[in-house]
Amino acid sequence: MTNDNPRTVIAQGTFDLLHPGHVHYLEEAAAMGDELYVIVARKSNVDHKKAPICSAAQRRDVVDALEVVDEAILGHEEDIFVPIERIDPDVIALGHDQHHDADAIEDELERRGIDCVVDRASGRESTREDEVLSTRLIIDRILERRDR
């Protein structure tokens, strides 16, 4: 039976140097609905950590290649809510460690007339001793090994 009203989910993030933690987040987000759209942050919107290494287009293309993702798009340069308004999701899935305040997002969504739930995905523990689940830690490991 086909669902005439598919449940649309948005996940968002920087997704620089894609790693298993990103994949876990996107798999959980996809499980929250029927269609998963991923908004990939532009460099101009990444102010809570160092700028991404890879270009926005490259990060979008890598995320878009994942089977669980229906469509990956670039975020808006100035207003992060513009693509959310266009997609009009049922759910916004936040990553377990993302800095966003769910209550503040819900307030802004309500102000803009967007009726959706904000949920937070769970974290993922390393399953192997050598597994790295953080872009920052991947970069640190690269720098450490290059200094040898």
From Swiss-Prot:
Q: What does this protein do?
A: Catalyzes the transfer of the AMP portion of ATP to flavin mononucleotide (FMN) to produce flavin adenine dinucleotide (FAD) coenzyme.
What reaction gets catalysed by this protein? FMN + ATP + H(+) = FAD + diphosphate
What protein name does the entry list? FAD synthase
The subunit structure is: Homodimer.
Give the protein family. Answer: Belongs to the archaeal FAD synthase family.
According to its UniProt record, which cofactors does this protein need?
A: a divalent metal cation
A GO term, aspect molecular function:
ATP binding
Q: Which residues form a coiled coil?
A: none
> Which UniProt keyword terms apply here?
ATP-binding, FAD, Flavoprotein, FMN, Nucleotide-binding, Nucleotidyltransferase, Transferase
Q: What is its EC number?
A: 2.7.7.2
Q: Which gene encodes it?
A: ribL
Quote the Pfam families the UniProt record gives.
CTP_transf_like
Organism encoding this protein: Natrialba magadii (strain ATCC 43099 / DSM 3394 / CCM 3739 / CIP 104546 / IAM 13178 / JCM 8861 / NBRC 102185 / NCIMB 2190 / MS3)
Which residues are listed for ATP binding in this entry? T14, F15, H19, P20, G21, H22, D97
Q: Per the UniProt entry, what are the Gene Ontology biological process annotations, in alphabetical order? A: FAD biosynthetic process; FMN metabolic process
Recorded hits in SUPFAM superfamilies, A to Z, give: Nucleotidylyl transferase
The first-level EC class reads transferase
Query: Which pathway does the record list?
Result: Cofactor biosynthesis; FAD biosynthesis; FAD from FMN: step 1/1
Source organism, top-level taxon: Archaea
